[in-house]
Amino acid sequence: MGLVKGNCGCYWGIKGHWSRNCSPVCEIANKNYYSRRGIAPRRTFWSVSNKSLVHLDANSLMIDYENVFYYTTDITSNKAIIESSERIRQDHGNPSVLINNAGVANGKTILEESEDERRRVFNVDILAHFSLVREFLPDMIKHNHGHIVTVASTASFLARPQLVSYSCCKTALIAFHEGLSQELRMRHNARKVRTT
């Protein structure tokens, strides 16, 4: 979270979004991690206000920590995202910070990669971001408070062999971020919902 806090101030200044009443400290944040095998993306919500940490992961995790909660969720499924989002809102409230950092890659050439493998990359690396934003952005707009962080990759600018589908998704994330930023400002008049 320290990296996010450091980058937020820099970005807000560049975009002219300085605000004294909005701290970049995350009240409830969504982050993404990977399982040990690197194939199961995990989403994590962190709450400063009630000190809860909520993980969404395709695998069932059984690590017992105080104030840490796990939700088994297949983020390639929009239905599963909606169901988990509803449970999170019931149990922890709406997140005010969403950090989209999910990413998987197959490491195969275009000809080697199966259609199912390619669709999985797109479902995790870009489409899950749309689904999560649709779930949590309305409350941020309503309160004109929140932050959505979209993490792309250098692969957005340099497509490498055996990472073409991954690079396509990461490039799409840049357009996603830029379009979302403009919609918040020009269509929703939610200038205090930040994007990084």
Swiss-Prot record:
Name this protein carries in UniProt: Dehydrogenase RED3
Binding site for NADP(+): 47, 74, 101, 134, 166, 170
Pathway terms, separated by semicolons: Mycotoxin biosynthesis
Regions annotated as coiled coil: none
Recorded catalytic activity of this chain's protein: a primary alcohol + NAD(+) = an aldehyde + NADH + H(+); a secondary alcohol + NAD(+) = a ketone + NADH + H(+)
Protein family according to the UniProt entry: Belongs to the short-chain dehydrogenases/reductases (SDR) family.
Active site (UniProt): 166 (proton acceptor), 170 (lowers pka of active site tyr)
Top-level taxon of the source organism: Eukaryota
Organism: Cochliobolus heterostrophus (strain C4 / ATCC 48331 / race T) (Southern corn leaf blight fungus)
